[in-house]
Amino acid sequence: HSADRSRALKVTPYYTRVTDYVDALRCPASLGGACATQTPGGGKFVYLQFANQAARLYGIDVSGKAPLASTRVGEFGLEGLVGYTNGRNLDTGDNLYNIMPLNAKLMLTHRHGGWDNVLEVAMAAAKDDVSAERNEVETAGYALANLRASYSWPKVRIDLGVENLFDTFYSLPLGGAYLGQGTTMTSTPVGSVPTWGTAVPGMGRSIYAGVRVTF
């Protein structure tokens, strides 16, 4: 970081090996599973059993900030975060379950008097390094705009904001499978079994306001 800490860059790489990582294996048909452990089971939910296996995770987190301009209407700055994780089951060679894909946040900040405002763009790449063993659902990449503003007095702060400003439809990379997509969600009866392959959608446009008082 710079001497006045107005500029900063932090890079954190990591590498981890786990000898008894709690993962999962397909249940064999003899135990009541939907299919034998060696069959793909594509397009279906699968029966699983916990298993301790060797795993490897590595990744990197990068964060930084820098001032952009100092004007009569306030101080403008730029802040950013980037994260990447890769996880693999060393016993099966499969991708680890529920690993966040490459993601980033870019924030344009503005401060003037009691005002503290942020325009944020939150992004995630497509999740296609999924666990085949669990038949994990893939998700598409997305970019969301969020707008936040606050005004502070010595003991009171007012917060206002809009999350997902443009009401973008997206699926949560770590949301799992949507189990509501069955007979109650479609005009065509599909029995009592939910449809596989529908990811849990993210929240639409959300507007909030709040007041914080310090005693």
Enumerate the language-model features and the residues they cover.
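Exposed loop/turn and edge beta-strand positions of beta-sandwich/beta-sheet ligand-binding modules
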Residues: 5, 58, 74, 102, ...
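Gram-negative outer-membrane beta-barrel transporters
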Residues: 8-18, 34-132, 210-214
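C-terminal beta-signal and adjacent terminal beta-strands/loops
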Residues: 17-19, 24, 125-128, 150-215
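Extracellular/periplasm-exposed beta-strand and loop segments of Gram-negative cell-envelope proteins
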Residues: 22-31, 38, 44-55, 93-97, ...
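Short, glycine/charged-rich beta-strand-loop motifs at protein surfaces that mediate ligand recognition
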Residues: 4, 12, 133-138, 145-149, ...
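Feature captures outer-membrane beta-barrel proteins of Gram-negative bacteria and organelles
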Residues: 101-112, 143-149, 181-182
